[in-house]
Amino acid sequence: VCVAEEPGTDAPDSALEQMARGLSQGLPPGGERPALVDALPEEGLVPNSQRFFHTHQSLNYHYYLARENILNLGTENDAVLARYQAGPSTLMLVDYREESKASEALTSFRDQITGGIEASEPRSGAFVASRQVGPYLIVVLESASGEASETLLNSAATRLQTLQR
């Protein structure tokens, strides 16, 4: 459970933590770790950096990508974001459940972020790469090198192939 305060409020961290614990305890028992989280490559994963979410608003809270919902995220999608030491890099995996929806999201992402290509070095100097594997979208953000982004992209693609329906 993620609980955040609005800018300008002075809620103590202990109160926010207490609220998050209360919400967590109110969730139904038996919840399982989402399979998409298990698809994250283990090598270089920063401990406790995984963030599971569904919507564009949640993505932008954890990692601001764009004002518009360029990935077509919604409650019907599962997504996970994690940081990696190599690079360092940020990796995002999204399950669209249908290849056509993943393809639309990939095209939108590339059109908006990488000029329509798989990998690029945007003006910020950090590398970005993306790929589709069946109904899944893989995005590597803020990688220090093209080689690091490609390695992480390939590792994630290999792990996602084990989840193929």
Question: In which residue ranges do the predicted regions lie?
Answer:
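Soluble, non-membrane globular domain cores that form compact, hydrophobic packing
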Residues: 1-165
